[in-house]
Amino acid sequence: AMNLMERKAEWRGNLIILLQPAEEVGSGARNIIKAGIFEKFPRPDFNLALHVSADLVAGKVGYVPGWAMANVDSLDITVKGRGGHGAYPHTTKDPIVMASQLINSIQTIVSREIAPIEAAVVTVGSIHGGTKHNVIPNEVRLQLTLRSYTDEVRNQTISIIRRMARGLAEANGLPKDLYPE
């Protein structure tokens, strides 16, 4: 901003510096627009969006025309089962095994269900389940991040994950009240 103001004679127009909150969870821009940003300030003729990148060395600036980064969705899945003692796994519906099956299935979405000319990323970033060596828990929680450039691919990916989770629950003989959320 200071650099632009020092060179004000070299450009003309309105300068709006906007720091977007909650950009990683996808709600920041939506909330700014709902709050009336374009009623309070003039619409800019040009937009310049900045974001840090693990690909760039500190102090370097990268640029691309058009799309620079994909949209992001966070998805939480609770894989439910019926816990029990580790010595009697045959009396349980093990959510750790089911969660690992789901994770392996999810890894095929981009390579086998999304068109090769589209871009998508599905990452399982967190798995939480169980607290003891010899106890099968009642549930496992997964945290995923999804990235895509279009709403069509976004919706398709979410739909596939839901289908896989329901199919896995059915294949493991779970009653419908224990299907993943």
Residue ranges and their predicted role:
Residues 1:
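DPxDG-like acidic metal-binding loop motif
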Residues 4-137:
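Histidine/acidic-residue-rich, glycine-tolerant segments that coordinate divalent metal ions
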Residues 77-81, 140-148, 178-181:
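Short, hydrophobic beta-strand segments
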Residues 98-101, 156-164:
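A non-catalytic, amphipathic alpha-helix used as a structural packing/dimerization or gating element
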Residues 110, 162-172:
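A common structural junction motif
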Residues 122-124, 176-180:
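Generic structural motif
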Residues 133-159:
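A conserved active-site cap/scaffold subdomain adjacent to cofactor or substrate pockets
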Residues 157, 172, 178:
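C-terminal catalytic subdomain
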